[in-house]
Amino acid sequence: MIVVGYSADPFGRAAVEHGIEEAKRRDTGLLVINATAGDAYVDARFARSGEVHDVEAHLQDSGVPFEIRQPVGVDATEELLTAMDSPDAELLVIGIRHRNPVGKLLLGSVAQRLLLECPKPVLAVKPHGF
């Protein structure tokens, strides 16, 4: 299983695209996780129902078996790391942003923790043009 950390932006969409490619390459399924620690109504990265429908339609068209999870009130990093503890999990795919010098120092707490703590390979991707 390929686990994708999805955010409702071009970086999340790039992660889904690469996740689909990897799932096809490995002949496995896809688990897409879009989690928020706060209120879903104020978290811009949390996908709204229309966005989830679009992702779901795209995944159905891909032919890859998939599941979408949208836990609310949880730490996104912990949710992804827990998913990666599954014996079926092979690869974690996340979208990553280009950062300014200060941002590079910090990397982004979610991406940094995932890269450092994930027990299995992590593929960090950017959308074309970023």
From Swiss-Prot:
KW Acetylation (keyword) present: yes
Range of residues in the leader sequence: none
Keywords noted in UniProt: Acetylation
Record note on modification: Acetylated on Lys-104 by PatA in the presence of acetyl-CoA as an acetyl donor.
Classification via CDD domains: USP-like
Sites of N6-acetyllysine modification: K104
Superkingdom: Bacteria
Entry keyword annotation includes Acetylation: yes
Family the UniProt entry places it in: Belongs to the universal stress protein A family.
Designated name of the protein: Universal stress protein MSMEG_4207
Lineage: Bacteria, Bacillati, Actinomycetota, Actinomycetes, Mycobacteriales
